[in-house]
Amino acid sequence: MRRERGRRARRRVCSFCVDKIEHVDYKDAARLKRYITERGKILPRRISGNCARHQRQLTVAIKRARIMALLPFTVE
């Protein structure tokens, strides 16, 4: 399934902006899990579709949640 030449994929919208979430909360582990790969890595902005502001907040929130043992650093 190759993309046609000259055709660009549609840009994903930031889910935090759509839901009008001002700050990303590190205690919301269910939401944060959507932005982590099965290997435990944080998804990049071009894949997740987040805006730059919320991607920065998301990164800090995931790192805090890992330290508080709400999210794993790696998979077993």
UniProtKB/Swiss-Prot annotation:
GO biological process: translation
Species annotation: Symbiobacterium thermophilum (strain DSM 24528 / JCM 14929 / IAM 14863 / T)
Protein name, UniProt field: Small ribosomal subunit protein bS18
GO CC terms of this entry: cytosolic small ribosomal subunit
Disulphide bond pairs: none
Entry keyword annotation includes Ribonucleoprotein: yes
NCBIfam families hit by this protein: S18
Protein family (similarity comment): Belongs to the bacterial ribosomal protein bS18 family.
UniProt key word RNA-binding: yes
Protein function: Binds as a heterodimer with protein bS6 to the central domain of the 16S rRNA, where it helps stabilize the platform of the 30S subunit.
One Pfam family from the record: Ribosomal_S18
Gene3D superfamilies: Ribosomal protein S18 (4.10.640.10)
Molecular functions (GO terms): small ribosomal subunit rRNA binding; structural constituent of ribosome
